Amino acid sequence: MASENKQRPGSPGPTDGPPPTPSPDRDERGALGWGAETEEGGDDPDHDPDHPHDLDDARRDGRAPAAGTDAGEDAGDAVSPRQLALLASMVEEAVRTIPTPDPAASPPRTPAFRADDDDGDEYDDAADAAGDRAPARGREREAPLRGAYPDPTDRLSPRPPAQPPRRRRHGRWRPSASSTSSDSGSSSSSSASSSSSSSDEDEDDDGNDAADHAREARAVGRGPSSAAPAAPGRTPPPPGPPPLSEAAPKPRAAARTPAASAGRIERRRARAAVAGRDATGRFTAGQPRRVELDADATSGAFYARYRDGYVSGEPWPGAGPPPPGRVLYGGLGDSRPGLWGAPEAEEARRRFEASGAPAAVWAPELGDAAQQYALITRLLYTPDAEAMGWLQNPRVVPGDVALDQACFRISGAARNSSSFITGSVARAVPHLGYAMAAGRFGWGLAHAAAAVAMSRRYDRAQKGFLLTSLRRAYAPLLARENAALTGAAGSPGAGADDEGVAAVAAAAPGERAVPAGYGAAGILAALGRLSAAPASPAGGDDPDAARHADADDDAGRRAQAGRVAVECLAACRGILEALAEGFDGDLAAVPGLAGARPASPPRPEGPAGPASPPPPHADAPRLRAWLRELRFVRDALVLMRLRGDLRVAGGSEAAVAAVRAVSLVAGALGPALPRDPRLPSSAAAAAADLLFDNQSLRPLLAAAASAPDAADALAAAAASAAPREGRKRKSPGPARPPGGGGPRPPKTKKSGADAPGSDARAPLPAPAPPSTPPGPEPAPAQPAAPRAAAAQARPRPVAVSRRPAEGPDPLGGWRRQPPGPSHTAAPAAAALEAYCSPRAVAELTDHPLFPVPWRPALMFDPRALASIAARCAGPAPAAQAACGGGDDDDNPHPHGAAGGRLFGPLRASGPLRRMAAWMRQIPDPEDVRVVVLYSPLPGEDLAGGGASGGPPEWSAERGGLSCLLAALANRLCGPDTAAWAGNWTGAPDVSALGAQGVLLLSTRDLAFAGAVEFLGLLASAGDRRLIVVNTVRACDWPADGPAVSRQHAYLACELLPAVQCAVRWPAARDLRRTVLASGRVFGPGVFARVEAAHARLYPDAPPLRLCRGGNVRYRVRTRFGPDTPVPMSPREYRRAVLPALDGRAAASGTTDAMAPGAPDFCEEEAHSHAACARWGLGAPLRPVYVALGREAVRAGPARWRGPRRDFCARALLEPDDDAPPLVLRGDDDGPGALPPAPPGIRWASATGRSGTVLAAAGAVEVLGAEAGLATPPRREVVDWEGAWDEDDGGAFEGDGVL
């Protein structure tokens, strides 16, 4: 097949891919520059030349040993004289046909090409240093072509130069067990095809030239020298340069030059950078890893939560612009000289600027890479454009061929290879380094599509499928990136008439909220800047002036540097605290923290003199640069924690970089910083202090890992930091790495449990922290020393301990399991044994954040008390000094007997405020009648402000808080509506539900279990029955969740967005405002049962109104501002729009709403001026509920025909805050089952307008255009008591179940 595609170089044919480039080693195969040939039989630019799939082709072309050849035989034994004669004739023909490049005109070699085969290092090191191309030697080394096995006698790993090369003593090489095990991991089976033959090149770099010459000579003729007499019948070698053995001594001396050494190192680095190779350049076989396919992965929830920690717009780590005068070419960090001003580049640039189409051969000299990327990306999304065929085989002109050849000539490569790393697969796609430097992940679409287009492994139909897959995958990414980086979604009111702007704004909330650079790559870059910050000169430009400077000025500078150093310590504490909070307070889970050690700062080169730089702690300019970078890292970590990006791959890299930055600053400033007598306020701050004291963090992390909660970890931090005050450093010099004389972890025999005064009532989950201070050589203590040491190092009291044997105190904190059977699972024994003392409960709950009536709910939940204690600062030193020694029965904590506080002040952080916000829904727990339990989606939060996991991701399979509130408000919930949490800019208003006694309780709320059990016992004490509606799935139910007694009414149901026909059947546009009703789904069916139970249990109370539009108001971004409450009443709307109702209304944000053809409802919400003036801004249309059977739902909309579907398609229920839900029975075809006419909207218009314009999902429709439409009277609520017996099958039967 290869013979059918033979073409001479430089003559592009109709079957060629990118324009060809002359290549000596591929003269007879029609080289295409980077090795990209035709799909029928050419080479694949991305394939592995040593891959097993290519061995057949290699054997057919003579590039690999034939089947049955012993791999252990010598090359001379396996090659016959006839084959050698044929080889010699081929070499002679190649010598005649290949033009020899002019050495003087050749530019210096650029390390942009990384070869996978043995021809990667075709030049001698001395020739590299002298600028000689030595083409003859390169031709002689062409014997092992790409894809060939390495010589069995060649070494696969470099050896020391002094060791002589091994010589083969026998005709056959018999591998032994020792040689096999020591042969650098190379095997003779499947890994042989993955081993790299370029390991010989490393031996060239190590100086074994004699062995190289002998090995190269064996490739042509048997023996150590190519000058040996030829055997009978053997063709003499063609005339050419002298044998390699004669030319070896001359370049040997020049190989020691710095240029040759630098080139050798660069080539070794270039070979090691090839994908799939280790540090020495050998291929490494990837080991398969076990992959867990859980329910989250199969349902898509895992991929919906995927984060990588990187932010669009920030450079990829290691990527950057090329040096001046050069352009990106090759691998990461490689470049070539630019061609600006060359006639080929200028002519191609003019054609590119005038065409308006992507260039078939693109080079950086043509202009901005963003333009070419944008054109290719838009081309890929153009139907019937044959984008894949264009990427594989574009039509080129002679100017394109000239440009490609000029770029290849200037790169400095002598010949081409399909395994070179070029940064792009196709000629038309710009170098990937420009996308990496710009942080544009969407630009990867062009490279992925080009890789598919150039592949030989897919046919046309398969490539079309892959292109569709890429389009669907990249579309949301491109929407977010373009909106965030071009500002299309950041200007409210600008371009509001464009229907695409709204979609872009909804698609990019997370991207717009994060400035470029505040991601994982930004933190890595900050670490690089911090490490490279130069030291300031001692006296500026004049050393004499610095020597004779005034003493007061010097003291002032040192004082200023000291203040900046203290701020650096505070910033380091902030970094570790941000990391700890990002990993839920578990310091042991922070990557890189367990092995953190203070690092010595980089010292300036050269001998120290009178003008040497000042020490780091006195270098104020350098400290200010460090402080700036440390604060940047701290802010970036906080943003990553809020987005939920710390527990992903990029977040781990960012965490390691942040820890390294802290270690670098600690090593420079630790010896000179003054000691703070105060105890650390958190475990993270204690970790920073230990680093600055050159102490190991392992005892602290071990104590934190074994502690039951974060409060015990902080206690361990205090224990680790307390002995530090009385210790002296051995020397004021910089901190040394923990090699020989570093501190060792304390012995575990001495612990607080052995000290007098401790008893069995110690905190049960965690061992007591060590009482001996960590030191290199602990001295024997006096008899009274154990008690004093235990009193000095005793940690702050923990919040939770074991329940006392004599029984818990009624005012203590412990789980009150309701008596008798329960609807939900009972908590575990460990949860029932957790106990908090009355005094600790009183201190922890005494905060304005917790309303007084709701504090008993915290008393019912020890886990909540432990969470509060973890956020409290340590006790004051005065309180600790006043503490007595022993424990007592009532207060097992040593600090309680002296009258001091057990815990320091509570730090009410944002997450804690959000978790405690539920306590303000209903002021008095006695007024709670209905409790709705729900599990929010990641990012949903009833308190507003966004949860710590970042913005929520829309899910059609699982409902959360958004769907729950939409059902209670009798409205639809979609990703583009105000009901979706991703569009909220503030906390939704649910006060109308609270006024009815309905409490919404999340599984993430503080004291979730204690609150449910407290409300149940409170209702039982008042001889009342509580109504509990549980929408939490079994897989989301928390461990040791609340126990709901069977004395109360309990109703379990599901929360499904797919009950909305717009979500379940998006193609059925006539059913967009229809919702499927069921007694098992949170909606009208469940509400009817709850309302009936409420009327039965509380006959004197006002009736519940659960499915009403006035129950919930949202705060979203509208044309009136970023924080507008909707639905807005008509009066509020008229007051808000009044300032714009003048002659300059066209310039205001209400232009589109006041236009004659403006849609009345956008995404079922009031939008036009007429609709907003009538119902209010954002007032939603009410859906029509249809109770269909299971079979009808499974059948889909195709089989749902008849009057009911026509009614749902034409019905238009105007917004009404007090209207009940409209429910239709799906199987009722009798008379009177449907209203006489579908409800609609009548407009009082002088222009004769009668239709309502609806815009949703990119389409516009008009309903109610016929005359005579009138809004029918409201229908009464359907009697649900017996409506669901047939459908539910007794699902809610049982004691205490509605």
UniProtKB/Swiss-Prot annotation:
Bias (Basic and acidic residues): 48-63, 130-144, 210-219, 544-554
Keyword Phosphoprotein annotated: yes
Taxonomic lineage: Viruses, Duplodnaviria, Heunggongvirae, Peploviricota, Herviviricetes
Compositional bias of kind Acidic residues: 37-47, 116-127, 199-209
Protein family according to the UniProt entry: Belongs to the herpesviridae ICP4 family.
Region (Disordered): 1-82, 94-291, 534-554, 594-620, 718-826, 877-904
Keyword Transcription regulation attached: yes
Compositionally biased region (Pro residues): 11-23, 100-110, 234-244, 599-618, 764-783
InterPro entries, per the entry: Formin_Homology, Herpes_ICP4_C, Herpes_ICP4_N
Pfam families from the UniProt entry: Herpes_ICP4_C, Herpes_ICP4_N
Comment on protein domains: The N-terminal and C-terminal domains are required for the transcriptional activation function of ICP4.
Signal sequence coordinates: none
Main localization (coarse): host cell
Protein name listed in UniProt: Major viral transcription factor ICP4
Low complexity bias: start-end ranges: 174-198, 222-233, 245-263, 272-282, 784-802
Annotated function: Plays an essential role in the regulation of viral gene expression by both activating and repressing host RNA polymerase II-mediated transcription. Binds with high affinity to the sequence 5'-ATCGTC-3'. Activates transcription by recruiting a form of the host TFIID to promoters and stabilizing the pre-initiation complex formation. Negatively regulates its own transcription. This immediate early (IE) protein is absolutely necessary for the transition from IE transcription to later viral gene transcription.
UniProt keyword list: Activator, ADP-ribosylation, DNA-binding, Early protein, Host cytoplasm, Host nucleus, Phosphoprotein, Transcription, Transcription regulation, Virion, Virion tegument
Gene Ontology BP, a term: DNA-templated viral transcription
One GO CC term, this protein: host cell nucleus
DNA-binding region: 262-490
Assembly: Forms homodimers. Interacts with transcriptional regulator ICP27; this interaction is required for proper incorporation of ICP4 into virions. Interacts with host TBP and host TAF1; these interactions help the stabilization of the pre-nitiation complex on specific promoters. Interacts with host GTF2B.
Gene Ontology terms for molecular function: DNA binding
Location(s) in or outside the cell: Host nucleus; Host cytoplasm; Virion tegument
PTM remark: ADP-ribosylated.
